[in-house]
A protein has these predicted regions:
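Mature extracytoplasmic/periplasmic regions of secreted or cell-envelope proteins
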Residues: 20-173
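Bacterial N-terminal signal peptides
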Residues: 7-15
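Positively charged n-region of N-terminal signal peptides that target proteins for export
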Residues: 1-4
């Protein structure tokens, strides 16, 4: 009986997640994904890059706040791009004879190719942002190692100097 109840509760929890998987991501979800990718790529420099509150515990929240506008732009741009692809009369010609719905697939009823397209485009934007953050971190570490005095003059000598550098050099904020 316990196993049946556990199984039913897991199915009940999984249903909203499965339904959500077909919808295009919201700007908040995109900002969270950007910050999760940045946290993974920056490692310990993540907290210094985004700063923290007095209890030194809110770098992720500050990251999400700082990426909110970029996330909104990523979702809007992805949506515009996908709408343009869907309306393109030559789409099948440039995609091996496949229609928009065939290229991006869809849900079980085949009606969510647009959502899949937007989701893929946003994932690409998140990956590009993570790559930019990692590249900025490498560049900043190299600059700090090459000339500590110049680095300190530009970004300060405090423990958040590396974070300031990464924020400044990251192409997408």
């Amino acid at each position: 009986m316990k196993k049946v109840m556990l199984l039913l509760s897991l199915v009940a929890l999984a249903a909203p997640v499965a339904a959500f998987a077909d919808a295009p991501p919201s700007p908040a979800q995109t900002a969270n994904a950007m910050c999760a990718a940045a946290k993974t790529s920056l490692g310990t420099a993540f907290a210094t890059t985004y700063g923290t509150n007095a209890s030194k515990s809110n770098a992720f929240g500050k990251c999400v706040s700082s990426h909110a506008k970029a996330a909104q732009n990523a979702v809007n741009n992805a949506s515009k791009s996908c709408k343009a692809q869907q309306a393109d009369a030559n789409f099948a010609t440039t995609h091996g004879g496949q229609s928009f719905a065939q290229v991006y697939g869809g849900s079980k009823n085949g009606k969510n190719a647009m959502g899949k397209c937007v989701s893929q485009a946003v994932q690409s934007a998140v990956a590009a942002q993570a790559k930019a953050s990692k590249s900025a971190l490498k560049s900043c570490k190299a600059a700090m190692k090459a000339d500590k005095a110049a680095f300190a003059t530009t970004y300060g000598a405090g423990k958040d100097a590396l974070g300031k550098c990464v924020s400044a050099k990251s192409a997408t904020k």
